[in-house]
Amino acid sequence: MPRLQQKWLNSRECPTPRGEAAKGLFPTKDDPSAHKRVSPSDKDIFILCCKLGIALLCLGLLGEVAVRARRALTLDSFNSSSVQDYNLNNSENSTFLLRQGPQPTSSYKPHRFCPSEIEIRMLAKNYIFTNKTNPIGRLLVTMLRNESLSFSTIFTQIQKLEMGIENRKRRSTSIEEQVQGLLTTGLEVKKGKKSVFVKIGDRWWQPGTYRGPYIYRPTDAPLPYTGRYDLNWDRWVTVNGYKVLYRSLPFRERLARARPPWCMLSQEEKDDMKQQVHDYIYLGTGMHFWGKIFHTKEGTVAGLIEHYSAKTYGMSYYE
């Protein structure tokens, strides 16, 4: 036997993991029924299908029980007479809420109440009838009008709104705590309606708005519209008495402060500007300093003419 063939036979005889794993899958001379034993029989498949069917049936029954229990609880907690009163009431609120906008064809049933609809109306009764400007009430009105959102979405939004309202209340009650905390610093503290003020220098500051000891002097007071530049070469303006960098203003504010509008000038300033224009047009006076910067041929000729005419007619300031 050739050497290569001998080597091939030896390699076939030595056991490999792949060969060991595939031992029971194929019929061999020693075990002809191996493949029949591994594959499941029809009986096994039938039992598995039965188990799956029973499990699905149990899940469906559990879901149905949960839905019925929830519906029963909802109806118990909300007595049906008030539902009818709410529905048939001709007051401003009920007409404002109900039968406006398209009704959904799939979920809405005229002859019976959906639990979610009852819950929405309960919430609407709580929120809207007490205060129409309540954001939660407005949200519910929107929802009842177009019914585009699911009740769970609405409910999470209501929870968020309620949390926001609670936070607002908490923040307003914590002013006293802020005052107590700031009093320990030794500064003079004043309590406002919505916040606390601390006296630094001769001015009152909200905590966190103090930007360093810049002093208002008559020369340094920034122009209200165009602003000034501070020591860091940042342009700044005063907003409600605070130093605000020009770049941190919103776009419309920056646009409004680009130049002082005409209406902000006093009547004397307006008249003075008109007089300057009038003098320049009719008398040729004023704005002579530009001649020191821009020298043009036409300007020189005009200056000479003006000079000689002034000597003749005496309409210049030179005499």
Curated annotation (Swiss-Prot):
Membrane topology: Single-pass type II membrane protein
Spans through the membrane: 45-65
Function of the molecule: Superantigen.
Keyword Transmembrane appears in the UniProt entry: yes
Positions annotated as glycosylated: N79, N89, N93, N131, N146
Segments on the Extracellular face: 66-319
Protein name according to UniProt: Protein PR73
Gene that specifies this protein: sag
CC terms in the record's Gene Ontology section: membrane
Major site of localization recorded for this protein: membrane
Superkingdom of origin organism: Viruses
Basic and acidic residues bias: start-end ranges: 28-39
Ranges for region Disordered: 1-39
